[in-house]
Amino acid sequence: MTQLTAGKPAPLGASFDGKGVNFTLFSAHAERVELCVFDREGNEYRYDLPAREGDIWHGYLEDGKPGLRYGFRVHGPWQPEYGLRFNPAKLLIDPCALRVDGDVKDDPLFLDGEQQPDPRDSAAIAPRSVVVSDVYDWEGDSSPDIPWGNTVIYEAHVKGLTYLHPAIPKEIRGTYKALGHPVMIAYLKHLGITSLELLPIWHFASEPRLQRLGLTNYWGYNPLAMFALDPRYASHPERARDEFRDAVKALHQAGIEVILDVVLNHSAELDLDGPTLSLRGIDNRSYYWIREDGDYHNWTGCGNTLNLSHPAVAEYAHACLKYWVETFHIDGFRFDLASVMGRTPAFSQQAPLLEAIKNCPVLSRVKLIAEPWDIGEGGYQVGNFPPPFAEWNDHYRDATRRFWLEKSLSLGEFAGRFSASSDVFKRQGRKPFSTVNLVTAHDGFTLRDCVCFNQKHNEANGEENRDGTNNNHSFNHGIEGLGGSQDVIERRRASVHALLTTLLLSQGTPMLLAGDEHGHSQHGNNNAYCQDNPLTWLDWEQANSGLTHFTAALIQLRQRIPALTADTWWEEGDGNVRWLNKDAQPLSAQEWQNGMPCLQILLSDNWLITFNATQDVVEIVLPDGEWRAIPPFAGEDNPVVVAVWHGPAHGVCVFQR
């Protein structure tokens, strides 16, 4: 192979120009950077990157081509007390690699020393970065650009959603291809989903601890290479990018957006006892938040925390997000532990990455959803993200469960959550869509498990049931587990209907966990991050089709009610909402605070939702007018006309006049 010439300092990563490959790498503290390329036999050839502009090291390989496998060895001081941990014995993944080949094994070759750098060479087992030529025919594809007011999000796992679907060809189940299969798209359209939110598909690794237990990181919240698509959901690693883009294109043609759950808060290098794979060896002090003793600030609970207030790291993350929008036509992002994005180290709305996203013409137009917390001091930031971010609303999740399952919530608090949590989000010109309402998510009980289990049952995770939250706000209706008498089963069914009705008819952006609409259970496991097995895969042959139709009818109903699709906050007397007691009278101050958990909500003056969260049948007098119960609470051709509703325990109904 030829020697390197200087090349250019941009863009970051490996760029093929038709004749050769330009390589660039950021490192502020390195003293020397070697590019390591590998031939088909695995032989390694090393070249010093010959040029440096500021903190960008770069070089051009004239005969480099797509498919070339490479990595870096970075030389510099070993001063762990200052956060400097350079060790050229470790082959490092390009942080901007567009493809990575190989998995991270539980192997001591990846580990480094405490006082001295570990001299063992990791190249024999290290994953390889791969040069990619990015050509794809989008055939005029464009984003469905669903208005926030009409958005219904469906949170799903690529494999778990499709792996057991009997109508999808067996050879593509559990893959990107399956997402774009006509059967899956038809199902999402029938359900009324506008936006498919996928759990992480950036190339990720399984933690060594899980590997020793014979488990894997199923969810994917352990990123290895943030520009690289994970190949495990492809028919072949080389086809992953096109197969995923084919799926995005097919979903777009059906009017469905694709949102990615992304992890910009930590990396798969974990704590100082974890593997050295990329960022730690490239520039540990720049990429991570470092304590005064040289260890990591662990505000993520995963061992390390990315320092997104560092200008170069913020630009790296910004470029990554832009890349996914421009190259894969992604319609939005959900940011895991998003408070890290605003740390300076205290949380600030003006943090570099948040400012870059807000001012970016590419990113500011896509959907942006923050998980507004991390585990560090000051990490809980619900309601504090700037526009245009929406946020997961755990207030809503807990309040809705408490109202229906624990009977421990005032009507005032319930109404506040039902009306887009205006006390939390009505600021800085934000709209009602800013709250992403959820009752369940990948993290926690499924909806069915919320009504079947009082306690978590996470023994299969290998931590003696210590992992996962104990604060579930669930109710098993008298017996722990999925079994029970017919009475128990009926009360659980009513509670599920009530929770779904509340979720899908509240103001704000609803998010539905895949499988909740057909009764999926994880048998009480509320932290199934490492369960790549039938516990998490949706069982389509056992799906509760009645519950699926109920959910689809609710979503269809939601889209018909102006008060739920408009981007305006509800105000007293504006005709959007009226709050009534069981006698059709305005709720009194006493009832708001201490009234029985029973109320009527009149939306857009024509739709009436009646809620009875008591244990008894309650006679509810409807307001004046001719009210008809409507689907999914009555047949389309045989609506029930009533003036008084005898609300069963845990009961809900919707009427139209």
From Swiss-Prot:
Looking up SUPFAM superfamilies in the UniProt record yields: (Trans)glycosidases (SSF51445), E set domains (SSF81296)
UniProt keyword Hydrolase, yes or no: yes
Broadest EC class?
hydrolase
The positions annotated as site (Transition state stabilizer) read 443
Quote the EC number. 3.2.1.196
Q: Which InterPro entries match?
A: GlgX_C, GlgX_Isoamylase_N_E_set, Glyco_hydro_13_cat_dom, Glyco_hydro_13_N, Glyco_hydro_b, Glycogen_debranch_bac, Glycogen_debranch_GlgX, Glycoside_hydrolase_SF
> Which GO molecular function terms does the record list?
glycogen debranching enzyme activity; hydrolase activity, hydrolyzing O-glycosyl compounds
Q: Which Pfam families match?
A: Alpha-amylase (PF00128), CBM_48 (PF02922), GlgX_C (PF18390)
Pathway in which this enzyme or protein is active: Glycan degradation; glycogen degradation
The domain of life for this entry's organism is Bacteria
Catalytic activity, as annotated: Hydrolysis of (1->6)-alpha-D-glucosidic linkages to branches with degrees of polymerization of three or four glucose residues in limit dextrin
Indicate the residues that form the catalytic site. Answer: 336 (nucleophile), 371 (proton donor)
Residue span of region Disordered? 460-479
Arranged from A to Z, the UniProt key words for this protein are:
Carbohydrate metabolism, Glycogen metabolism, Glycosidase, Hydrolase
Sorted alphabetically, the Gene Ontology BP terms of this entry are: glycogen catabolic process
Function field: Removes maltotriose and maltotetraose chains that are attached by 1,6-alpha-linkage to the limit dextrin main chain, generating a debranched limit dextrin.
Report the sequence similarity comment from the record: Belongs to the glycosyl hydrolase 13 family.
Name recorded for this polypeptide: Glycogen debranching enzyme
Tell me the organism: Enterobacter sp. (strain 638)
